[in-house]
Amino acid sequence: MLWCALVLPDLALQVFTRGRSEAAPLAILGPRPQLRVVAADSTAMACGVEPGMGRASALALAPGLHLRERAPALERAALIDIATWAGRFTSSISLDPPDTLLLEVQPSLRLFGGLTPLCTRIGDTLGELGFVGQLAVAPTPLAARWLARCAPGSQIDTHAGLASALDPLPLAVLADGAEPATPASLDLLTGIGARVLADVRRLPRSGLARRHARAVTAQLDRAYARIPDPRPWFVPPERYVARLPLPAPTDQVDTLLFGVRRLLAGLSGWLDARQAGLERFTLVLEYERHYQGHEGYEEPHEIVLGALSQDMARCQLLAREHLTRNPLPAPVDALRLEADNPNPLTPPRTDLFDGDDGQQGDPGLLLATLRARLGHDAVRCLAPHPDHRPERAWRWIDPSPTSNAAPTGPLDLPSSPRPLWLLATPRPIARPAAESLLTGPERIEAGWWDGPAATINRDYFVARSHDDCLVWIFQERQPPHGWFIHGYFN
């Protein structure tokens, strides 16, 4: 096995900074009542803010400082989101809380062209989620974790290289991991002069066991591959839900779209792992607390893609159309993205001589964009309806490909031409000259089953008007035998 450890030492900070596009200073406070700084971004640290500093001191150094209390629940959710995204690289993933992800990457090396290209790809695309991490590769998960924390970028792909890579690591790594060494054990080792792992390995194992440091030897055995280190596998969710708290409430669409892009990067990984696409997803705006007099007000936007798609640029475009269509009623405090029912994507069919000149637009994207911009009900299309009366021979239907409103069987269409532009109400005209009548008459007598008011009895003609247009006119067969124009052919 070959393990890639992805360590996020600044996860407590990045769960808040990943949703912002500007570099306002930000610091994270520890638990109450002390409320001391546990992490700060580079802008805050440039002002003198450091971990361990009190809240008042931090604000005095950086008056524009944004302070957020540490959110362990957000950190756990972020680790799960990253694990879900990492499914695009390997299906063998293990969570190693509080800030580490373990990927078993041996089967993925050929697909990504080797170990170095794979690690580069992981690090680069992690940035699209808004996170920055440290990577290392080793034959055991614990060794990979320690190397990622203390020697990021290390790539140890054989057991023979483990000892030389791990021996120089400081003693403090023993406090890192799922089963860390106790402070008493570390004090014991420091007291007898141990400074690095090589010093501990030279000590008698029996002596360590008598001094209650058995956990230390077990850690080293797992790291150096002397005993197995089984890990539970992460099972990705069947339904994708990701939430992004914003650093500060905002009603700026561009700021929201920056956060949407972060969420879509995670969705892309979830879909990649399934080789699937979506037809729709939901973007939920969580408004600022106490908006409209109560907490928890949120507004869902169902974004229809117009076709089965995995294209995040398409998703971003349609999200923009939804967010810019109407003003936001209040500042948004957080974004949430929800998606389910992914369907397998089929490879695109290409012509042997396919080229740029033969490419066509995407009608599904056009339809989805128009609906996002104008509203769902503002976009409709015409369909034939089985009725001989021209004004009732059509109807509005949903233009979606999945709509059940479109006719499915063969249609009994008239043999004579019909104009595309039909007037809502026929307009009276003078009796036309005989030479202007090009075809006809076509007699239409129908509607008696709907009552006298709906019955028509007409003779239709195709004629040329005085302004050289082709028009569709008729004469009533009932007195007073008036003439009317009903539509235009051009």
Regions found by a protein language model. Give the residues of each.
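Amphipathic, charged-and-aliphatic alpha-helical interface segments
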Residues: 42-43, 47-49, 161-202
